[in-house]
Amino acid sequence: MGNRLSKIATRTGDAGTTGLGDGSRVGKNSLRIVAIGDVDELNSHIGLLLTEPDLPEDVRAALLHIQHDLFDLGGELSIPGYTLLKAPQVAQLDDWLAHYNAALPRLAEFILPGGSRPAAQAHICRTVCRRAERALVELGAAEALNEAPRQYLNRLSDLLFVLARVLNRAGGGSDVLWQRERES
């Protein structure tokens, strides 16, 4: 593959606009760019989680796969009307959700983000994913969007919650439970 980006600083965005993949320009605060930015931030947080040295290999492989899907989603959002994320990617998340959740004990109480460092990072990914999902919902209220990306982010946030629990156990720990009857 040749050089896709040979010039990084183009100065074309200095006035507060940015170019989309179809050649159009939009404000850097547009709903579409906010959604792209939130997806990009999520992908970066997943990249940070992937730097954890003791991640189970199956979790590492799933997260790397998800990073590629999120990059595709960013591409889809950067070209209005373009479709990259489809039902099979959502189904893959459903499969991983069922697989990982089946091995976990039932929750009797809410859990707090934390436990091990990888689990805490997975919770950060989950909350950024929820924000990206909200941005996509807002964009979808303003213009027509493919349905799969919204479904994908909804499932992904659930999967990241489950993976946080898995990662706590993989590190020899457990979930941090919310204490309903704690002293003030």
Swiss-Prot record:
- Cited function: Adenosyltransferase that catalyzes the conversion of cob(II)alamin to adenosylcob(III)alamin (AdoCbl) in the presence of ATP and an electron donor. Acts as an accessory protein of IcmF that functions in cofactor repair, since IcmF is prone to inactivation during catalytic turnover due to the occasional loss of the 5'-deoxyadenosine moiety and formation of the inactive cob(II)alamin cofactor in its active site. Thus, receives and repairs the inactive cofactor, which is then reloaded onto IcmF in a GTPase-gated step.
The record, for NCBIfam families, names: PduO_Nterm
Please give the activity regulation comment for this entry.
Answer: Is potentially allosterically regulated by GTP/GDP, which enhances its affinity for AdoCbl by 5-fold. Binds cob(II)alamin weakly in the absence of ATP. The presence of ATP (but not GTP or GDP) increases the affinity of cob(II)alamin for the enzyme, and stoichiometric binding is observed. GTP blocks the transfer of cob(II)alamin to IcmF from ATR, thus averting its reconstitution with inactive cofactor.
Please indicate if the UniProt record lists GTP-binding as a keyword: yes
User: What is the name of the protein in this document?
Assistant: Cobalamin adenosyltransferase
Keywords of the record = ATP-binding, Cobalamin biosynthesis, GTP-binding, Nucleotide-binding, Transferase
Chain positions recorded as ATP binding sites: 10-13, 18-19, 28, 130-134, 154
Is RNA-binding one of the keywords UniProt gives this record?
no
Pfam families on file: Cob_adeno_trans (PF01923)
**What are the EC numbers?**
2.5.1.-
Q: According to its UniProt record, which reaction does this protein catalyse?
A: 2 cob(II)alamin + AH2 + 2 ATP = 2 adenosylcob(III)alamin + 2 triphosphate + A + 2 H(+)
Which one GO biological process term can you cite for this protein? protein repair
